[in-house]
Amino acid sequence: MNSAAAPRDFHLLAKPSGSTCNIDCTYCFFLSKEALYPNDRSRMSQATLETYIFQLLESQPGAEVVVAWQGGEPTLMKLEFFRHSVALVQKYLKPGQRVQHTFQTNGLLLDDDWCAFFKQHGFLVGLSMDGPREMHDAYRVDRRGKGTFDLVMRAWQFLAKHEVDVNILCTVNAANEHHGRDVYRFFRDELGAKWLQFIPIVERASADTLALANQGWSETPGRKRLLYTQEGHLVTERSV
């Protein structure tokens, strides 16, 4: 009797633009990585794209496959790159496989062409937004330090116009942590968002803060944030 476990489905997240981004969120841990890859060497080539799509589809044991794009900011790769990625999926799709395309973006470059493409191919688009204007603009700023709220709202309107499925990705940070109800009502009532996801911006616990990490949310003035412990060096969040 063969007791070997059956192969399990797995999920991969691709960052075709590497760490390159067109905004400068002050809580982002990833922007400094650009210095490691000069001369655009972090950008995914057409050859690498084809190899990636082929291997992703070929190695999946199950019928459900997610092709997920993130960044940096993936729209910097231009729309034609993702048109080609969809064509490659169709080229290498195995019999019985079903593909879900997902795409995480700050929204600044979205327009009618992008959103028509997303709708045509059934993309689930994650749009990064931290709440109403004053909360969003506290950290999600451009390279000049100017808030990006108006540009993200424009992206939301393009997505809504084309009836694209959208998941709002909101970080929980020092600007909005005490305004959960306001944030939720903004997304639910003003935007009419159907899918919401919240990710805390947290700080690793050091030896000096271990007791506080074990305690969880601190009631000490100025320390009302969650610390965490970890093994290894796989998590790279930065606190604000």
Question: Model regions: which residues?
Answer:
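Short, flexible, mixed-charge acidic loops at enzyme active sites
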Residues: 26-27, 130, 211-215
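Conserved alpha-helical substructure of the radical SAM core
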Residues: 1-116, 120-121
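Hydrophobic/aromatic residues located in beta-strands of well-ordered beta-sheets
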Residues: 67, 101-103, 125, 166-168, ...
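Conserved radical SAM core fold
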Residues: 33-35, 72-76, 107-112, 124-145, ...
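Glycine-enriched alpha-helix->loop->beta-strand junction motifs that scaffold or abut catalytic
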Residues: 119-125, 191-194
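A conserved non-catalytic segment of reverse transcriptases
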Residues: 125-126, 152-156
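Radical SAM enzyme [4Fe-4S]-AdoMet core and its adjacent flexible, acidic
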Residues: 142-150, 157, 161-240
